[in-house]
Amino acid sequence: MILVNTDYISGKEFEMLGLVKGSTIQSKHIGNDIAQSFKTLVGGELKSYNEMMNEARALATKRMVVEAEELGADAIVNIRYASSAIMQGAAEVIAYGTAVKFINK
């Protein structure tokens, strides 16, 4: 599956199959959350939250790809990500794009 954030793939013609998306809501262990809150007092990277967001993006992307495969897509174009805080220590990540099928592979 080809994944791009542009609305084209160089050298490929395709037909659009429709919108595909994947999402997840992730949270961290309460102990990690407390440790990270202390880190905000002194500054620096919040590695635990970085890991959480990376995991969430990967899972949302995987779910989007599964949806595209169910449509028989060869690629997903114009991929975008959005995130929002659901509550302290939890975030929702959404991946979405347009599933396409190549013409004259």
Model-derived segments and their meaning:
Residues 6-9, 81-86:
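Short, solvent-exposed loop/turn elements at beta->coil junctions and helix N-caps
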Residues 1, 16, 52-53, 64, ...:
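Detector for methionine-enriched segments
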Residues 1-32, 70-74, 93-105:
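N-terminal presequence-like segments and the immediate start of the first folded domain
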Residues 39-41, 90, 98:
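A generic membrane alpha-helix/interface feature
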Residues 86, 91-92:
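Membrane-proximal amphipathic alpha-helices
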Residues 20, 25, 33-80:
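Short, well-ordered alpha-helical segments
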